[in-house]
């Protein structure tokens, strides 16, 4: 109040360049251009890719566990199921202390810990959102349940900054909902994978039908599926076809607090 624009310090500073002779401005510009070449650049200006990397917004680890059409071939490429599981364990930092993301965007402490946790997964990145389900092709539904529940518990909250990154048109929030329901769709494939349902009961409208998902024993400890039925028929595979899901009916889970051998029949691959 009472301050005229001509006296505003910021304006005087902004107008300072007008008082520098053009010849001096050219010299300053040349020096700045020369100094810029000395700065360390992480990105190639011509491609936007990381320097010395052929990957965008990720590494070979982040893109290695996408749910490709031929996942069985991916398992074989790793040297078999056990070695594939070992790679996934390393990717997720399995067995390490969980890192709780910074719920307050101004909190740099937990954010720094997230990047110094000696693991490669970043659940804020789309390629990594589906990676927990790669365990299913090695017959390890229990690992999928462990990782998914850990992600939901430690990376999401209802408070300020409650998502682990940019929602990207609903990508993260919809991933939370799918995971909490105990289902996860596979991009470009006619299957929906079974994870670890959090809700004791949920009803979904699927086209003109209704699908009821019942997991009466679900809880913070009971994260493993012991048995499942679809419309009363036993289901020992950790996946549904899209046609089965959209036909509606009732999908029921019996939950367990200890790992089970549910999901021994691995999802299909399409060579």
Give the positions of each predicted feature:
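Active-site core of glycosidic bond-cleaving carbohydrate-active enzymes
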Residues: 2-198, 202-212, 217, 243-245
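Short, surface-exposed linear patches
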Residues: 157, 200, 234-236, 251-252
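Short strand-turn-strand beta-turns centered on an Asx-Gly dipeptide
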Residues: 207, 227-233
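Surface loops and adjacent helix of pleckstrin homology
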Residues: 216, 233, 256
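Extracellular attachment/recognition segments
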Residues: 224
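Solvent-exposed beta-strand/loop surfaces of large extracellular or lumenal domains
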Residues: 231-241
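C-terminal beta-strand-rich structural cap/linker in extracellular carbohydrate-active enzymes
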Residues: 242-271
């Amino acid at each position: 109040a009472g301050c005229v624009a001509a006296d505003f310090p910021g304006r005087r500073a902004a107008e300072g360049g007008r008082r520098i002779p053009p010849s001096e401005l050219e010299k300053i510009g040349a020096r700045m251009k020369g100094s810029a070449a000395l700065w360390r650049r992480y990105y190639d200006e011509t491609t936007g890719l990381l320097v010395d990397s052929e990957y965008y917004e990720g590494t070979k680890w982040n893109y290695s566990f996408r749910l490709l059409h031929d996942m069985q071939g991916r398992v074989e490429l790793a040297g078999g199921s056990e070695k594939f599981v070992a790679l996934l364990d390393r990717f997720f930092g399995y067995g390490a202390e969980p890192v709780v993301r910074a719920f307050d965007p101004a909190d740099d402490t937990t954010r720094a810990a997230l990047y110094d946790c000696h693991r490669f997964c970043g659940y804020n990145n789309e390629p990594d959102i589906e990676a927990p389900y790669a365990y299913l092709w090695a017959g390890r539904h229990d690992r999928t349940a462990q990782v998914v529940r850990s992600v939901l518990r430690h990376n999401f909250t209802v408070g300020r900054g409650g998502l682990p990154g940019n929602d990207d048109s609903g990508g993260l929030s919809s991933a939370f909902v799918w995971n909490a329901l105990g289902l996860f769709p596979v991009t470009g494939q006619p299957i929906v994978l079974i994870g670890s349902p959090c809700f004791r009961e949920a009803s979904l409208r699927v086209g003109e039908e209704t699908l009821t998902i019942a997991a009466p024993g679900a809880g913070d400890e009971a994260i493993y599926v012991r048995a499942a039925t679809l419309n009363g028929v036993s289901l020992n595979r950790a996946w549904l076809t899209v046609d089965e899901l959209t036909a509606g009916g009732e999908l029921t889970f019996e939950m367990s607090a200890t790992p089970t051998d549910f999901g021994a029949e691995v999802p299909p691959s399409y060579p």
